[in-house]
């Protein structure tokens, strides 16, 4: 659903280890980021083995971390992933459609000469299959539109990603298609469906409540549980970094649009929030790297995302101390302590950016999360909405997540959707911790955005009351980003955002746009903008999908 904070304050022995031989740098370009990710995919074998590689400089960092987190060593020893939850694969006869990636990979287009003959669709797809079934709207009552659910299967690696597709309520033959991704990492996109922007929500009586401001009012939407072992998705193994998840997304979309070509000709967009600020630049880059594809990617949208940690972490102190438009929630001494910690935090993040090494990126995550987020978190306030306290710590401050979990764990719901796991959880904190301990948290995926801007429009929007991925940091990184349109973007003026229906002239936000880059600040909204500002969110999304702020 969002940046999950239960593991923000963990200690890590890997915070102080020497770089492995052959560590790849995450600098510029998608290929270098893929190489760097490969170097961090193997988890630590034992705590003691990792400690043996500690350098004197790393030892100093580790000693500092132990002062900050006294039980860090014990927490590090218990990091290693637990067994996946039980699952039972349904027979092929339970599905209406099965698409084999090997069949798509075998499709060729004959040219006038042998040199001009080429595969119809790029990418290694032979290990992937897609299963789909029609969902009877009358059984669940979430919406009356055509729906499909199913799994993308990576047969070679025992990975199975669950998705739920809703057709547009308006004109599905022509309306765009949107892929929605929640963050975490490790939180189910079905919470986005049933809590934020989907056609229905779950109330305290575990009943469906119609959402008149659903994003599928004017777009067909795919809600995807990813990476594996999130929501209804499952695997015998795990995914611990964003790049590894990117190939699964490309395969899912390729096979889905092959099975359902009636949606393939429409414009396609990727949208998400929170840790999707990591996912989306990588996933979009993966798609665009394949020149022969059946995915008509037109834009990406990131809401209250974690995209550039170096800039984002600079703005935690201002947001908590009264400079983000809301009153201070920390004392002067606490604010000063955050100021004092910032230079070290930024130095560690920069080291992660420069090296791309897990041994640099993990300590940056641990130190900065403790020093820059910890003081706020210890107040008991909602990290996703600075305006109030955390109402339900067992459900990431929102009781509605508990309602959703109860609904999605009902046998009749799981059967209607074809879910193959034994139970549903809104967030898998093993995944969250796994991504953190493999160095993914601080990776500079924002460096992929300039190349995206050369090809497609990018929207960054942020609710102004969020703390964890606050608007100050999101505005800051968009203005710091090095790209060819930087000067014009930074000189662009803000304009008010008002509802297109014009029945209310009071602005619900403000927007600045130049070239392919657009930033929106949404008023009176926390981390989940569609939840706090339902009508405004569907307003700006519909206008964005229609191309209102796209470069001419």
UniProtKB/Swiss-Prot annotation:
Catalytic activity field: Release of a C-terminal amino acid with broad specificity
Xref: Pfam families: Carbpep_Y_N, Peptidase_S10
UniProt-annotated catalytic positions: 274, 466, 527
UniProt keywords, alphabetically: Carboxypeptidase, Disulfide bond, Glycoprotein, Hydrolase, Protease, Signal, Vacuole, Zymogen
Enzyme class: hydrolase
GO molecular function ontology, one term from the record: serine-type carboxypeptidase activity
Residues making up the propeptide: 19-133
Alphabetical list of Gene3D superfamilies matching this protein: 1.10.287.410, alpha/beta hydrolase (3.40.50.1820)
SUPFAM superfamilies named among the record's database cross-references: alpha/beta-Hydrolases
Any single Gene Ontology cellular-component annotation: fungal-type vacuole
Family in the record: Belongs to the peptidase S10 family.
Name of the featured protein: Carboxypeptidase Y homolog A
Source organism of the structure: Pyricularia oryzae (strain 70-15 / ATCC MYA-4617 / FGSC 8958)
Organism lineage string: Eukaryota, Fungi, Dikarya, Ascomycota, Pezizomycotina
Gene behind this protein: CPYA
